[in-house]
Amino acid sequence: MAHPRRFRFGVQLNQAFEGCTWTESVRELETLGYSTLFVPDHVDSGMGPLTAMAAAVTATTTLKVAPLVLDCDFRHPAIVARELATIDLLSEGRIEVGLGAGWKAVDYTQTGIPMDRPGVRVDRMIEHAHVMKALFAGEPVDFTGEHYDITG
């Protein structure tokens, strides 16, 4: 009989526990047995996900980290790829990635970024993912798309 996969639990956190620092909070999550820390990416939801994820992996040894999810409209894919690669290096492979097309109108209002119709946002997210995948392959990237152009 095949052995079933171990069931894992993740937790979403966007600020430190009351009375604790961020470092203490993520260490407590690891001690409690959580497998993954998910950090949301909304302008009004506390900490920035990439910085919070980087801090979490340097404070823990087994806890995986992931954005829940990165809104592609707010960051260029080349910058996101670089930041995620850095977190992957710091964590020795404990990063998971989620990308999103954006849905929360207040994020767009508060940043002054126009909120395009859903189809445009989804197309941009798909292109964003293609660019990141190409960059992660480790070769020079020349890409011309509808939303992004990358050279070198």
Tell where the protein language model's regions lie, with residue ranges.
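N-terminal beta1-alpha1-beta2 module of alpha/beta enzyme domains
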Residues: 1-64
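Internal, glycine-rich beta/alpha segment that forms the wall or movable "lid"
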Residues: 2-7, 23, 76-152
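Structural beta-sheet core signal
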Residues: 11, 67, 97-99
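Active-site-proximal loop/turn and secondary-structure-junction residues that shape catalytic pockets
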Residues: 13-17, 43-44, 71, 101-105, ...
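Structured beta->alpha junctions
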Residues: 41, 69-72, 76
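Alpha-helix-loop-beta-strand connector modules within alpha/beta enzyme cores
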Residues: 49-70, 124-131, 135
